[in-house]
Amino acid sequence: MDPSDFKALQANPSALSFEKAAFASLYEQNGSSFEIPCGIKLFGGSARYLNKKSYALKFKKEYGAGKLNYQVFSNRDYSSYDSLVLRSGSQDYEHALIRDVLMTGLLDGQTSVLVQAYKPVVLYINGNYYGVYNLRERIDDSFISNRQNVSKDTTNIIKIDREVRSGSIKSYDELLNYLETHNMALQENYDYIKTIVNVQDIADFWIAETWATNNDIVNTRYYQNAYFDNNRWHAIMFDMDYAMYNVGHNYFAFSTDPEGMTEHGYSTTILRNLLKNKEFRALYLERIGYQL
């Protein structure tokens, strides 16, 4: 890419929509490769301000190709992408580097909880070495479409801080309101929730988060799609760079605190209220045994 464009990109971490034209190439050990024009922008939240930055590659018609058509990940059965992410390791890049891919890799394919595929790569930008990165899927409506083989047009993706990543927050707010205003100890209320939430998926997600003692909880994401699983809510595991730091932390108390998680008070409404139900508690304990 133009060196001045890259310099401007690096110097403006607070410019969330700042995107520049680039050309991406991947060369694999088996000799296969792709080369494609794309857009590049900084990726992440606070990690945008770190020395080793993460990047999103955007495949758009304005750059010459509307999609990347290439089998990037051997454990995925699709080969069309609107975007990919080059993750630096974020807060873990000066430590283990592998926390995020380790945790999501342990869960991948073992439960219905979605995680990003990854491929370790060595990154060069304009011929300069930038270190070891993880090439990953980008979590958006196209990711849900690829993973669940459904149209992306009716996808809602909501972060635990209420940021809408795709679609609308309306049905998510309705879910939280129902949980807060109806006693989940009553079986008829829990039976209704089972029609709009995949409770095993939610249990598996929070069990994994508890095992990993992931304190950077803001990137918790829930999703639903009208064409998948009767539009029930599911979870996505993402951003585990802070996993396995504070292993003595009482994470169960943390994730069920009525005041919310961290100083920001991120909602514990879903898990906390589900645990009021005897059937869900039995499922939760059963899934702990399965996952361990």
For each feature predicted by the language model, list its residue ranges.
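Active-site acidic catalytic loop and adjacent metal/ATP-binding pocket
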Residues: 57, 197-252
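Solvent-exposed, polar/charged alpha-helical surfaces in well-ordered, non-transmembrane soluble domains
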Residues: 101-105, 173, 177, 282, ...
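Regulatory N- and C-terminal appendages and interdomain linkers associated
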Residues: 1-46
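ATP-dependent phospho-/nucleotidyl transfer catalytic cores
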Residues: 70-91, 95, 128-130, 134-214, ...
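Short, well-structured beta-strand/strand-turn elements
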Residues: 109-123
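A conserved alpha-helical element in kinase catalytic cores
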Residues: 92-112
